[in-house]
């Protein structure tokens, strides 16, 4: 019986990609009081209408759906990860393979093709985070095993990167029966690929977008150059940045960006450069530079460009920095949102890193994720800093975002930056 149990556990595991078990959540960290200085759409606020309807305030074009039922990265969100759940297939239910395939490709639900390759020219772009399921039916697994793996794979594979689709009510019981029916139709031989790029296991990674420091190629460079005028312009208090920082921005700010994020004793918290600008500029010049405002981001790029080529040298040894880094690491491995995902699921080598999530190639934290931020996003025609990128990640996870200048995001950014220590700053980047 023990051998049979081990075989069943192995069979259940074949649908997903796993990894080492993530560290347990650390106890709640005492975050200092902080009133967000971000623009309204970047504060992570929820509005409640007269009818009680909750609407999330986010950037233009982003969903306004409230994901308040699911836990977040907030340090005061003490909700535990939902417990693994046993799924019970509906008695006598017969699945519809055609409907199951439609669900497998449904972008509002998954799509499952974001991680798994299956046959069909309409499957584009497929991902490689999970195994190729093109011949899954040849494995002849029992329906109950497949159903449980779709309902909640954590019962047998705690470190899975696959969401608990049924337990989190993303797919209904009837829909999972249809998915099981579809998966059982997938048999070999697999027809030859007509396009090698359809298959994420043979697809070539993008070569990039050219010289990121060429102003004719990267609009973020032009915006940073324009920010020099703001540097010299007096604010409401009659002072400008240039009055205290002698020389050009390139001269005065050389080396500054190499030290951020850092613990700022005056404010009792970790601050990224954008966070510091939001308080320092107003305090000294009277000019507000709220987080995620164009002015804040552009000045940040200008200051970081002054340190291009210099190695990042953040504090990783002081007791305050070490504690903050540990909290950031805990956040990195914390599962959040409707899909119960962690940053680590996409950005560590034993999980999703260096693989395709749909058409997106997932970066590896070990290679460094921070030194090209802020970056020009060709898909958005905007300059994004690291915090907006973090907020954007929350939407597909089904989690409410925090304020862009929250201490939680700052300490997560600090942890990420430890992997870039010693590597040269190269800002602004270009990414899709």
Enumerate the language-model features and the residues they cover:
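Bacterial N-terminal signal peptides that target proteins for export
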Residues: 1-9
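Short sequence/structural segments immediately N-terminal
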Residues: 32-35, 40-42, 48, 63, ...
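Post-cleavage N-terminal segment of exported redox proteins
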Residues: 10-97, 149, 180-223, 261-326, ...
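Sequence/structural segment immediately N-terminal to covalent heme-attachment motifs in c-type
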Residues: 70-84, 92-119, 200-208, 215-247, ...
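Glycine-rich, acidic and aromatic/proline-enriched surface loops and short helix-turn segments
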Residues: 106-109, 118, 152-156, 182, ...
């Amino acid at each position: 019986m023990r051998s049979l149990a081990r075989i069943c556990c192995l069979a259940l595991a074949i649908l997903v990609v796993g990894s080492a078990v993530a560290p347990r959540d650390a106890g709640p960290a005492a975050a200092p009081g902080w009133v967000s200085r971000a623009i309204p759409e970047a504060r992570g606020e929820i509005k409640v209408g007269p009818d009680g309807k909750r609407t999330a305030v986010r950037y233009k074009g982003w969903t306004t759906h409230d994901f308040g039922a699911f836990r977040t990265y907030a340090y005061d969100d003490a909700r535990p990860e939902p417990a693994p759940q046993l799924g019970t297939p509906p008695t006598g239910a017969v699945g519809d393979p055609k409907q199951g395939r439609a669900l497998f490709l449904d972008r509002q639900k998954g799509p499952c093709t974001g991680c798994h390759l299956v046959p069909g020219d309409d499957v584009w772009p497929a991902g490689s985070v999970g195994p190729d399921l093109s011949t899954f039916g040849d494995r002849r697994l029992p329906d109950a095993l497949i159903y449980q793996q779709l309902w909640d794979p954590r019962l047998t594979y705690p470190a899975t990167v696959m969401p608990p689709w049924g337990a989190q009510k993303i797919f209904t019981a009837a829909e999972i029966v249809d998915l099981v029916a579809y998966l059982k139709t997938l048999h070999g031989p697999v027809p030859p690929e007509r396009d090698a790029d359809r298959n994420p296991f043979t697809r070539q990674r993008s070569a990039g977008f050219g010289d990121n420091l060429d102003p004719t190629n990267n609009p973020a460079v032009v915006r940073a150059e324009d920010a020099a005028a703001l540097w010299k312009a007096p604010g409401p208090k009659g002072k400008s940045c240039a009055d205290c920082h002698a020389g050009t921005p390139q001269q005065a700010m050389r080396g500054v960006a190499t030290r951020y994020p850092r613990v700022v004793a005056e404010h009792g918290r970790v601050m990224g450069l954008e966070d510091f600008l939001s308080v320092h500029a107003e305090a000294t010049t009277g000019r507000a530079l709220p987080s995620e405002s164009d002015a804040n981001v552009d000045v940040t790029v200008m200051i970081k460009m002054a340190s291009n080529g210099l190695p990042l040298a953040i504090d990783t040894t002081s007791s305050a920095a070490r504690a903050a880094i540990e909290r950031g690491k805990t956040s990195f491995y914390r599962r959040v949102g409707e899909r119960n995902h962690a940053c680590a699921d996409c950005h560590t080598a034993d999980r999703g890193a260096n693989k395709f999530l749909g058409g997106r190639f997932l970066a590896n934290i070990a290679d460094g994720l921070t030194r090209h931020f802020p970056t020009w996003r060709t898909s958005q025609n905007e300059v994004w800093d690291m915090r907006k990128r973090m907020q954007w990640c929350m939407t597909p996870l089904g989690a409410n975002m925090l304020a862009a200048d929250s201490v939680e995001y700052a300490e997560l950014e600090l942890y990420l930056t430890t992997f870039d220590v010693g590597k040269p700053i190269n800002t602004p980047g270009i990414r899709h």
